[in-house]
Regions:
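Conserved, structured core segments of small domains
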Residues: 1-95
Length: 95
């Protein structure tokens, strides 16, 4: 499993102009089975994505994000192996 931390590198007006395209891109990632969860950081300085699959697949997906194409965000990918969880999140183990 991967934790992706997005940090905006442009004003929010630039982010907002691409937001609808970014949401479509997220929907495609969920449909492909790569994305598990996503959302904004608070304060609104970027976002966080939980993903699964192979790192190369994830990197290719991230490269197609409209935020990446427009160079308005940077991405930090952390691979994570959940060894313990709350019972309601057991499904995240062994991903």
């Amino acid at each position: 499993m991967f934790i992706v931390s997005l940090s905006y590198t442009a004003p929010l007006s630039d982010i907002d102009a691409l937001l609808d395209q970014h949401i479509v891109w997220l929907q495609q990632g969920y449909a492909a089975g790569l994305l598990l969860a996503s959302g904004r950081k608070s304060p609104r300085t970027g976002g966080v994505i939980l993903a699964r699959g192979e790192r190369a697949e994830l990197e290719a997906l991230l490269a197609r994000d409209p935020f990446a194409v427009a160079n308005v965000a940077r991405y930090e990918i952390t691979e994570f192996h959940a060894s313990m969880s709350a019972p309601e999140l057991d499904c995240l183990r062994n991903i």
